[in-house]
């Protein structure tokens, strides 16, 4: 996820490194450049996988560096699994202190969630701040010489949306809309939220802004924008449960499909995230495997693990 910050063309994020080498390149560059400090993004999965060694190297080199660990409990690269070998937040703060990190600050969307955790489980003098104060937290860490860490604790929004869809976690009822007749298209809501669901729309009165409801994560940070055009809507309690069609057909009565004469069959499927392309590929692959056929499959999901609007294409050879 932190690599995708480079897609934003504002020059604030730059440079790439191999997985697990985050921060190591700055330790080598630092003595030869005028810049005194650097922020280094890293995900929790990468940190627990191999990035912790790069942090240890930065501490050994006494680099003036702040790691920003995105603690979102999801490996977005491979399907939002839990990071292997991960530590919970209190254990992580103690680990960082033991490695020689000078200061650790946690930012989160819900600081009250930590009230039930015993203080003895945290590292000493632990600082917890609301995510709205993340800029102040970064300034505070930058002022400390040596290696510091900002841990941003917030669940992966894309995975949270999937869990809500499956009914595994609570879904907020309130929805946010923008009255296009009032909106002036200033874009402040997009700046405040940095959200992909805040999208421009062309109207007869010029460029306005809308909230894309299917992709909305119900984070509500867009309403922090200085704008009177927001509308908060709570839908009725009546649930729209779409029943599956009642298809009363026995499998034995389904005619066999026309078989190809070729010994090798190639299938190519194209879609977008959420349309079931990967699922269909897996079903066909499993069916062929059960018939003792050799199967070669390739899922190219791109960024559709994060954004349902991104392309997914699957190749299958049986």
Predicted region positions:
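Thiamine diphosphate
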Residues: 6-147
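A short, basic/flexible loop-to-alpha-helix module at the beginning of a structural domain
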Residues: 248-264
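Glycine-rich phosphate/diphosphate-binding loop of Rossmann-like nucleotide-binding domains
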Residues: 277-297
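Glycine/aspartate-rich loop-and-adjacent alpha/beta segment that forms the canonical ThDP
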Residues: 120-128, 136-194
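Conserved small/polar residues in nucleotide/adenosyl-binding loops
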Residues: 307-314
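Short helix/loop capping segments that flank catalytic or ligand/cofactor-binding pockets
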Residues: 5-8, 49-51, 58, 76-79, ...
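Short glycine-rich or small-residue beta-strand-to-loop segments that form or flank ligand, phosphate
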Residues: 41, 178-179, 266-272
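Iron-sulfur cluster-binding cysteine motifs and their immediate structural context
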Residues: 154-155, 160-166, 184-240
């Amino acid at each position: 996820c932190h690599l995708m910050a480079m897609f934003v063309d504002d020059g604030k994020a730059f440079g790439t490194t191999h997985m697990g080498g985050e921060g190591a390149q700055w330790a080598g560059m630092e003595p030869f450049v005028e810049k005194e400090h650097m922020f280094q993004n890293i995900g929790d999965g990468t940190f627990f996988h191999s990035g912790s060694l790069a942090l240890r190297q930065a501490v050994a080199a006494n680099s003036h560096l702040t790691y920003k660990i995105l603690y979102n409990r999801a490996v977005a690269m491979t399907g939002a699994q839990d990071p292997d070998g991960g530590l919970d937040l209190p254990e992580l703060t103690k680990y960082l202190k033991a490695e020689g990190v000078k200061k650790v600050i946690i930012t989160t969307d819900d600081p009250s969630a930590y009230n039930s955790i015993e203080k003895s489980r945290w590292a000493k003098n632990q600082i917890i701040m609301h995510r709205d104060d993340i800029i102040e937290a970064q300034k505070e860490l930058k002022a400390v010489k040596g290696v510091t860490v900002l841990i941003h604790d917030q669940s992966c929004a894309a995975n949270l949306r999937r869990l809500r869809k499956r009914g595994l976690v609570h879904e907020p009822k309130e929805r946010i809309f923008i009255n296009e007749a009032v909106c002036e298209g200033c874009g402040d809501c997009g700046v405040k939220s940095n959200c992909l669901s805040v999208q421009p729309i062309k109207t007869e009165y010029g460029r306005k802004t809308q909230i894309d409801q299917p992709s909305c994560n119900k984070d509500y940070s867009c309403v922090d924008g200085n704008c009177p055009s927001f509308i908060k809507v709570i839908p009725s309690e009546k649930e729209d449960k779409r029943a599956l069609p009642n298809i009363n057909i026995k499998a034995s009565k389904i005619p066999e499909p026309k078989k190809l004469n070729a010994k090798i069959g190639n299938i190519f499927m194209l879609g977008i995230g959420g349309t079931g392309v990967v699922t269909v590929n897996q079903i066909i692959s499993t069916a062929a495997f059960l018939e003792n056929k050799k199967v070669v499959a390739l899922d190219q999901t791109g960024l559709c693990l994060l954004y349902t609007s991104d392309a997914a294409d699957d190749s299958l050879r049986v």
